[in-house]
């Protein structure tokens, strides 16, 4: 995930000041821009010398051939003057013609040695430049609020009654319908482990079906993704911080060959956005094939490092969950990606309106954007039992930031020269099932149980078609009784 390097080159029409401003607006170090420019200049100088040396090697070989053809004396002394060696990459043809065959052969050896050194310098500078480049975020859209404080997220619009209060939170409700076992889940899987059971298994499948059916009508192709990604591919779609805070690493045998002791590193996906972004890796996509719309279906795995103490009970924030994701590839022209951005957040809004879940859509402040997003909208549902807004959807336009590193190019033919455009990529949650379950439970609770939203009743079994009864007491009430008893 990177910006176009030409954006840092003024002679190529780039404007580094725009990138510095974007970095400042993200509350990130703008000095990275200057470091990229410095390393790029070093890289270009070494690249120029490497090209010169390559041409010089060909010229020397040609000069040797001509002398051999003319049967000129080859000479016995291969020593070459220091001033010639110093100008190894700049020697002219007439200077080469004055040297003997053995001198030219010595010169060719020196060119080869210098080429190896220069090639190493080219690679070193390119790698150093890349390490700095990937730390610089996408250019922020002008409509993003510049702030580091999430309290300044701009509310774009709302739906439903956002003032209602209800008795129980999702933490209690999942237990009351006997749809969750966290104690056994923790024994089996560790912290935040859980078993989903009974009515909530059916509810989860109904939520998924509604999402897939609605996206299918909109032309989104369902794509069930791998759960693992190779390290080198994951590095092209994930930020460095995600490797430490979010991603699970899995080590296994490098091959199925008996006796092979090599180790293969893979990473569990945190979202289907990651494998789908890489689905067209190293491909050229014709204009007539765009936009390409996918409905990603996957289990997601997240370490949730940094979330210690947050949402430790229930199923709102867990290490493993199911998710339906919108992912779109489109033309980089005519602001098409911004039109699709509106469509994708609109798809999510329609979905939650069908489920009658109240929400607000917020424009995320600049300091809270991930590197890839030029702009991000979150859909935050109102949880009347918790008395809080909770994020259910994130919708991001990443422009060509992801596709550039993945080399997903836009066009019909492979261009040998000139600017190569890349497709734009967008992603938006449709539903992260455990979070949607929590929202449904809190918003549809009654004294006796949970009213099932009309939109998903067709996928529920007869005994839970319209209503899921409470069959266990609320943990919060049980805790209160115990506390009273102790007194």
Curated annotation (Swiss-Prot):
EC number(s) from the headed UniProt entry: 6.1.1.11
Binding locations of ATP: 302-304, 318, 391-394
Enzyme class: ligase
Record-listed L-serine binding positions: 271-273, 325, 429
Major localisation: cytoplasm
Alphabetical keyword list: Aminoacyl-tRNA synthetase, ATP-binding, Cytoplasm, Ligase, Nucleotide-binding, Protein biosynthesis
Cellular component aspect of the GO annotation: cytosol
GO biological process: cytoplasmic translation; seryl-tRNA aminoacylation; translation
Top-level taxonomic group: Eukaryota
MF GO annotations: ATP binding; serine-tRNA ligase activity; tRNA binding
Pathway assigned to this chain's UniProt record: Aminoacyl-tRNA biosynthesis; selenocysteinyl-tRNA(Sec) biosynthesis; L-seryl-tRNA(Sec) from L-serine and tRNA(Sec): step 1/1
Domain remarks: Consists of two distinct domains, a catalytic core and a N-terminal extension that is involved in tRNA binding.
NCBIfam families from the UniProt entry: serS
Family classification: Belongs to the class-II aminoacyl-tRNA synthetase family. Type-1 seryl-tRNA synthetase subfamily.
Full protein name: Probable serine--tRNA ligase, cytoplasmic
Organism: Caenorhabditis elegans
């Amino acid at each position: 995930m990177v910006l176009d390097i030409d954006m840092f080159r003024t002679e190529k029409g780039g404007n580094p000041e725009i990138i510095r401003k974007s970095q400042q607006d993200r509350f990130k170090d703008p000095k990275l821009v200057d470091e990229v420019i410095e390393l790029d200049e070093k890289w270009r100088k070494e690249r120029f010398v490497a090209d010169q040396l390559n041409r010089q090697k060909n010229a020397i070989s040609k000069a040797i051939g001509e002398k051999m053809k003319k049967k000129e004396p080859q000479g016995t002394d291969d020593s070459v003057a220091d001033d010639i060696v110093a100008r190894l990459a700049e020697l002219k043809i007439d200077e080469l013609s004055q040297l003997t065959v053995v001198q030219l052969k010595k010169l060719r050896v020196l060119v080869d040695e210098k080429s190896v050194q220069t090639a190493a310098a080219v690679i070193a500078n390119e790698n150093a430049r890349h390490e700095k480049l990937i730390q610089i975020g996408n250019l922020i859209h002008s409509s993003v609020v510049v702030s580091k404080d999430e309290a300044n997220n701009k509310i774009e619009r709302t739906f439903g009654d956002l003032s209602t209060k209800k008795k129980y939170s999702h933490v209690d409700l999942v237990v009351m319908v006997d749809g969750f076992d966290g104690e056994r889940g923790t024994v089996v899987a560790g912290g935040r482990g859980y078993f989903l059971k009974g009515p909530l298994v059916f509810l989860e499948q109904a939520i998924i079906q509604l999402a897939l059916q609605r996206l299918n009508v909109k032309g989104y192709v369902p794509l069930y993704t791998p759960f693992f990604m190779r390290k080198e591919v994951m590095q092209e779609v994930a930020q460095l911080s995600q490797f430490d805070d979010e991603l699970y690493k899995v080590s296994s045998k490098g091959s199925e060959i008996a006796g092979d002791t090599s180790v293969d590193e893979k990473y569990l996906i945190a979202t289907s956005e990651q494998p789908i972004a890489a689905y067209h890796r190293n491909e050229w996509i014709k204009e007539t094939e765009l936009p390409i719309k996918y409905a990603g279906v996957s289990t997601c795995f997240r370490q949730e490092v940094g979330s210690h103490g947050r949402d430790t009970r229930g199923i709102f924030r867990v290490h493993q969950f199911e998710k339906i994701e919108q992912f779109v590839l489109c033309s980089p022209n005519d602001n098409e990606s911004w039109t699709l951005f509106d469509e994708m957040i609109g798809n999510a809004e329609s979905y939650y309106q069908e489920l009658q879940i109240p929400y607000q859509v917020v424009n995320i402040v600049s300091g809270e954007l991930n590197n890839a997003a030029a702009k991000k909208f979150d859909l935050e549902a109102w949880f009347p039992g918790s008395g809080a807004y909770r994020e259910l959807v994130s919708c991001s336009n990443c422009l060509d930031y992801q596709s550039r590193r993945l080399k997903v190019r836009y066009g019909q033919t492979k261009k040998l020269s000139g600017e190569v455009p890349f497709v734009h990529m967008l992603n938006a949650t449709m539903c992260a099932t455990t979070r949607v379950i929590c929202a449904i439970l809190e918003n549809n609770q009654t004294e006796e149980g949970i009213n099932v939203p009309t939109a998903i009743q067709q996928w529920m079994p007869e005994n839970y078609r319209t209503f899921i009864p409470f069959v266990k007491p609320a943990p919060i009430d049980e805790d209160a009784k115990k506390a009273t008893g102790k007194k």
